[in-house]
Amino acid sequence: MKERILTSLIAAFVITSLQAQTTPAVPRLVVGLTIDQLRSDYIEAFSALYGERGFKRLMREGRVYCNAEYDFINIDRSSAVASIYTGTTPYYNGVVGNRWMDRASLRIIKSVDDPAYMGVYTSESTSPQHLLVSTLSDELMVATCGNAEVYSIAPTREMAVLAAGHAAKGAFWLNDETGKWSGSTYYGSFPEWVTTYNDRDGLDFRIGNLVWGPYLPVTSYKYVTSDAKQLTFKHDFSDERTEKYKKFKTSPYANDEVNKLVDACLTYTNVGKDNVPDLLTLSYYAGNYAHMSNAEYAMEIQDMYVRLDNSIGDLLDLIDRKVGLNNTCLLYTSPSPRD
């Protein structure tokens, strides 16, 4: 049974300032944005709440592929991201899910576990060893004789590593216990610019002051059921001890945190600064807060999409300032919309 991706498999977006002839044949930067839990029906249902810089710009100036499918079942973050960036199904790429039973040891293993490598800013040992084929980033590194700059940034470990592939220069994700951007020794030395970000502006310094409330007036949110707990909402993370970063990663602020590290990446690396094409693989989150039901958190999911729209707009503006959208190709897609 095939499962349809409820958003487009690839929505390709190339800004050309309305003059196609000014677009270089090879972009300086390719950005792959995978939005976890994104639903095309929600994109459409909440469209009246959006500004002009995010979804509407992508739809207006990009190309949308609507009739796309995953050619396998039991889709989750790992199997979907592996398939997106390898162009193959789990039968070939080896990643059948977030976790599975290892036949040799009869133990449950996670998709990016690898005891051969140490974690940086994390105790988790990680590599893409279970990916059995090359990825887009691997092929780009081969094609450029290793001269491309390839980085992956995501809230979750599996999305960061599987999108990065084998040959990227770094894959970074938010630590569930500390909020620091983490990595693996598999990718070599940990970049100084990420260490500096962690030490000076890490999430752990700011999370106590973050409060998530409605971005728009509550009367703007029309889809509120009788099961909704209240007519407004307010979530903060200051009282959480063990779960605050996990809950943070299911809030729209996780997408802003990705953008902040992208800003540092574009500032302190050579990404997009020469004619050798570079690749950034990014991940956002668009699911329910703390994985609760839509009925209970109907207002939050609408606000999630409003803030997601803003985050996409901020990302496009950031890339335009640092690299130039006329030098950039951006594609966005989503795994199947479920946890």
Predicted regions and their residues:
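Bacterial Sec-dependent N-terminal signal peptides
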Residues: M1-A25
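Mature N-terminal segment immediately following signal peptide/propeptide cleavage
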Residues: P24-I43
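Short, structured active-site-proximal loop/turn typified by the sulfatase FGly-forming signature C/S-X-P-X-R
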Residues: I43-Y92, E149-I153
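His/Asp/Glu-rich, glycine-adjacent segments
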Residues: T89, G97-V276, Y285-M292
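Extended hydrophobic/aromatic segments used for targeting, binding, or gating
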Residues: A168, D278-L280, A290-L318
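Conserved small/polar residues in nucleotide/adenosyl-binding loops
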Residues: Y332-D339
